[in-house]
């Protein structure tokens, strides 16, 4: 029998659990942060809707861009007019999803030139002594400060949303590759052979009144190749190198030249800027440093080299660049409208199909966009941030 929560949502975790369903009101494809949140909000807003959440992995946060998302909430990244949504997301992260390691952590946005709202960076070292040695005040003499910035674990948010959606009555089908079809989805239930190959064990055709495509960077590609629906969205492959310079719970998040130094696990996770969409057919590959192969892609390597004088720890052995691509964590990231500065969005593609995308600004705005789509599907006009 399928696993069942106390309140009725069923979970199919492996092919040994028979799946006999043939139709749902709503199928959400992809249980990352955006898909899991949308499923949860829809169950809360429309509890009579039969909903299935489908995930290729074995957990709602097992793989993809969500597990590698920076988890940095900052008002500095929020487009004008979206401030209330971002504030609602911050409150939700702090109170609504249990332990997602949410915590206030000021962000110092460092600059070489003076500008509106920027303070002398050297003066900030008295307030943030943990930042001493992380940047050169002579090279980056100005900074904007977001005292309300915070950090959290997006993967934990996705897992919490998935679990709560099931407790609220949603069904969850794991280890399943979903293909978009007219009027529904085709489900390939996956299993692993004794030679460690992932193969299709069985296939099901499922009718759905509405399909929410929350497949991250794979979503636009699936819409085009499986339904013939062209979109303007793109994707980029982002790596997150490790910097083993010590950090503490009091170390602020730093950003310079678009590069984020996110304190994590006693060191730093580096979040490089995304300059443009990757071309169709691009395959991630490591670059070369003075002729030596490294795991960091060339574009990211150039960003790190450019900032080494301003951020001295980058020029030390604390920076891990790896020997091959497999040494550096990375994932494909959706780019709404093909741009790195476009906020998350949802889009009606055709009758019965909606596309839901997070992207680079999912940390401060993703949950609000997922809620907005759920409310539209449920026919609810009010928004909690309005």
Question: In which residue ranges do the predicted regions lie?
Answer:
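Extreme N-terminal leader/targeting segments of oxidoreductases
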Residues: 1-26, 44-49
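Glycine-rich Rossmann-fold phosphate-binding loop(s) that bind the pyrophosphate
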Residues: 30-34, 56
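Flavin-dependent oxidoreductases
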Residues: 37, 63, 74, 91, ...
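Glycine-rich FAD pyrophosphate-binding loop
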Residues: 44-65
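Dinucleotide-binding Rossmann-like beta1-alpha1 core, especially the glycine-rich loop
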Residues: 69-136, 258-260
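Helix-loop-beta segment of a Rossmann-like dinucleotide-binding subdomain
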Residues: 100-109, 115, 126-168, 351, ...
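Helical element adjacent to the flavin cofactor pocket in flavoenzyme catalytic cores
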Residues: 145-206
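C-terminal catalytic lobe of FAD-dependent flavoproteins
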Residues: 309-386
């Amino acid at each position: 029998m399928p696993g069942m929560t106390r309140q009725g949502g069923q979970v199919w975790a492996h092919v040994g659990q028979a799946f006999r369903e043939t139709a749902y009101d709503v199928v959400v494809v992809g249980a990352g942060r955006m898909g899991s949140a949308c499923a949860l909000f829809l169950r809360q807003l429309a509890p009579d809707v039969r909903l299935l959440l489908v995930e290729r992995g074995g957990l709602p946060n097992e793989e993809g861009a969500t597990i590698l998302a920076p988890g940095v909430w900052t008002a500095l990244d929020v487009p004008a007019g979206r401030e209330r949504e971002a504030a609602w997301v911050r409150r939700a992260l702090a109170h609504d999803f249990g332990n997602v390691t949410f915590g206030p952590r000021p962000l110092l946005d460092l600059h070489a030139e003076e500008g509106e709202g920027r303070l002398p960076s050297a003066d900030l070292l008295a307030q943030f002594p943990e930042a001493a040695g992380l940047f050169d005040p002579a090279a980056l003499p100005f900074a904007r400060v977001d005292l309300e910035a915070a950090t959290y674990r997006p993967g934990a948010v996705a897992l919490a949303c998935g679990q709560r959606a099931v407790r609220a009555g949603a069904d969850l089908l794991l280890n399943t590759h979903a293909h978009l079809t007219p009027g529904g989805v085709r489900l390939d239930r996956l299993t692993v052979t004794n030679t460690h190959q992932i193969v299709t064990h069985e296939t099901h055709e499922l009718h759905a009144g509405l399909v929410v495509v929350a497949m991250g960077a794979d979503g636009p590609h699936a819409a085009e190749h499986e339904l013939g629906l062209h979109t303007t969205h793109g994707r980029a492959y982002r790596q997150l190198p490790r910097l083993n310079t010590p950090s503490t719970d009091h170390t602020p998040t730093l950003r310079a030249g678009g590069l984020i130094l996110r304190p994590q696990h006693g060191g730093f996770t580096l979040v490089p800027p995304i300059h443009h969409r990757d071309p169709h057919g691009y395959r991630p590959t490591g670059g070369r440093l003075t002729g030596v192969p490294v795991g960091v892609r060339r574009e990211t390597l150039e960003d790190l080299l450019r900032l080494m004088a301003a951020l001295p720890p980058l020029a030390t052995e604390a920076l891990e660049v790896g020997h091959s691509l497999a040494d550096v964590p990375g994932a494909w990231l959706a780019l709404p409208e093909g741009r790195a500065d476009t906020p998350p969005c949802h889009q009606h593609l055709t009758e019965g199909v909606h596309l839901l995308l997070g992207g680079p600004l999912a940390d401060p705005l993703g949950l609000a966009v997922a809620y907005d789509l759920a409310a539209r599907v449920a026919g609810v006009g009010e928004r909690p941030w309005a």
